From Swiss-Prot:
Catalytic activity: Hydrolysis of proteins to small peptides in the presence of ATP and magnesium. alpha-casein is the usual test substrate. In the absence of ATP, only oligopeptides shorter than five residues are hydrolyzed (such as succinyl-Leu-Tyr-|-NHMec, and Leu-Tyr-Leu-|-Tyr-Trp, in which cleavage of the -Tyr-|-Leu- and -Tyr-|-Trp bonds also occurs)
Protein name as catalogued: ATP-dependent Clp protease proteolytic subunit
GO molecular function: ATP-dependent peptidase activity; ATPase binding; serine-type endopeptidase activity
Coiled coil: none
GO biological process, one term: protein quality control for misfolded or incompletely synthesized proteins
Domain of life: Bacteria
Family: Belongs to the peptidase S14 family.
Function text: Cleaves peptides in various proteins in a process that requires ATP hydrolysis. Has a chymotrypsin-like activity. Plays a major role in the degradation of misfolded proteins.
Assembly behavior: Fourteen ClpP subunits assemble into 2 heptameric rings which stack back to back to give a disk-like structure with a central cavity, resembling the structure of eukaryotic proteasomes.
Amino acid sequence: MIPVVIEQTSRGERSYDIYSRLLKDRIIMLTGPVEDNMANSVIAQLLFLDAQDNTKDIYLYVNTPGGSVSAGLAIVDTMNFIKADVQTIVMGMAASMGTVIASSGAKGKRFMLPNAEYMIHQPMGGTGGGTQQTDMAIAAEHLLKTRHRLEKILAQNAGKTIKQIHKDAERDYWMSAEETLAYGFIDEIMENNELA
């Protein structure tokens, strides 16, 4: 169930679902697994807010375990495509594809709440049952290219070498807010709507 907010206007009461009300304040919620429908919703909101006023920042709140690489990269590409700066605020967790999205916020405007977590790892893939050997080889090559592309983005976002990201992402690499700040994926830790 989505909560409804009622506001008083000059024309009387107006009700909004909570997400529409947040959108009025240029806030987008990216929560749950990254998949095509969620990505399309986030992208549409980014494009709408940029068209409305590209001089004002957009606030993207992130709490995701990750998910689809293609859906996540579509969000990242849109964040880079629009003129408005996108501030990212990690709450809960940004894991896997979520780290790529959250770390792609505007430089100097990437934030994290004090008890949130970050996790990087190598991308996962599969070919399903009954796959021919040549298709498996193609899938493996694509997975390696995808890994390199993601490592390149993460390295740029954190100011690290691709070699360092590759090493750290070999297995699940969890970081606290303080560790994420030291690593370079965020710019500040936020407490009580203020910077720590």
